[in-house]
Amino acid sequence: MNISKKALLIGLIIISCIVIIFFNYSNNIKSEKNHDKIFVESNDQANLKEISFFNLDQEEFFLSDFNGKVLLVNLWATWCAPCRVEMPSLDRLEDILGDESFQVIAIAVEKTDISKIAEFYQEEGIENLKIFHDKSTKSGLYAKAAGLPFTLLINKEGKEVGRKNGPWEWDSEEVLEIINELKEIN
């Protein structure tokens, strides 16, 4: 191989490395910007109304049972450390804003017995959230999750308006403002 071919090959390798570094750097910047958002806007309008889950008495509920309410639907598990950390803020959010027009629905998605979830609520002093469970973990919501905790914000018409992967302080001023704005929309 002559010198000009070697120089060309080395040049292509250097340019390829620069391109790879640039794309990795720009993707990191984008993910940091998204991480700073509370909710990532979603255009996913899959039918959420038929998503089912159970309460402590093993009664089946569907998201459509809550039509007319703004919902903050949180998927979590007792074994998930970030989920356990954010549960008190979800409980406070339900205490602050929970009424006929808004509800936090925290659905434990795990194969454990629902009594273990009730024990967790008692140990952590969770008083305002109702106990909901999806033991099958086959919920359509679970399929949307990139991991736990996973939270959807749903408007009164039952349409997803935003989602959050990962934990958050759900009783923060920013969240209260967003939910209050949605509650006011007819």
Residue ranges and their predicted role:
Residues 1-50, 186:
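N-terminal targeting signals for export/organelle localization
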Residues 38-69:
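Short extracytoplasmic
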Residues 61-84:
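Short active-site neighborhood of thiol/selenol oxidoreductases, capturing the structured segment around
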Residues 66-69, 99, 126-128, 145:
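Active-site acidic short loop of glycosyltransferases
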Residues 79, 86-89, 150:
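Residue-level recognition of specific faces of alpha-helices
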Residues 84-124, 134-141:
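Structural microenvironment flanking redox-active thiols in thiol-disulfide oxidoreductases
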Residues 85, 180-186:
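Short, solvent-exposed cationic patches
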Residues 119-127, 133-181:
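Thiol/disulfide oxidoreductase modules built on the thioredoxin-like
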